[in-house]
Amino acid sequence: RSKMSPNKKFSIKDKIELSKILEKIEIKFDQRQTLDLLDDFHKKSRGHVIGVTGPPGVGKSSMINRLISNYRKNNFSVGVLAVDPSSRRSGGALLGDRTRFDIEPGDNKVFVRSMAAKDYLGGIAELTYPYMVVMRSIFDLVIIESVGVGQSEISIEDVTDTVIYCVQPGSGDVIQFMKSGIIEIPDIICVTKNDLEELSNNTVSDLLSSKSFFTNNLEWDIKITSVSANKNQGLNSL
């Protein structure tokens, strides 16, 4: 039974313990003891889980880096699960998303775990859900970054409370957005790189004009915003 709690001061020893727990889940996932441990974490208090998804190169990692900084300034603890694609030939993965995160080495209230998607479909990894269950019992906020996705990778909706879908400026017209199945899952649509002002503004306008066609299961009024991780613009609004 883990003694970790979101109410205690999180130390480097706790980070090591958390890493060991996640490793145990990976190696011994189907064992009764591991399932009991997950049940224990599932009953604890829960942080808010945010999913960040979108096509490759849209700027998800850079935006998450800014979000982490903003949350830490407001004294929220943050856990991050960064899912990277795997090679179909070698089975390996370059776990490079975390290199975009500019995190203070001594900040024990931020924890980043990289994961390989392997052959799991849907934009996340097979162990994303159990890892999330553990981390949301410890951190105020958990951010899950999906692999770069296309039109049908929507599993991130099943493991998060809020989904942010990132859109590249000038990446397509309204019809392209409407064709995409993934446009049905976000709570927030975020146009990245808004320092490309004209392109960004046009994309935001296109999305706003077709907003009535976007729906999600909760009948939530989908928010549309824009940010620039490069210039740190729009992050407070997001």
Where are each of the predicted segments found?
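Nucleotide-state-sensitive switch-loop elements of NTP-binding domains
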Residues: 5-50, 58, 67-152, 162-165
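Residue-level signature of catalytic and energy-coupling elements of molecular machines
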Residues: 51, 84, 145, 182, ...
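The Walker A (P-loop) glycine that initiates the GxxxxGKT/S ATP-binding motif of P-loop NTPases
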Residues: 54
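Walker A/P-loop
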Residues: 61
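Conserved Switch II/interswitch segment of TRAFAC-class P-loop GTPases
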Residues: 146, 150, 158-176, 187, ...
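Canonical P-loop GTPase G-domain recognition
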Residues: 185-190, 194-237
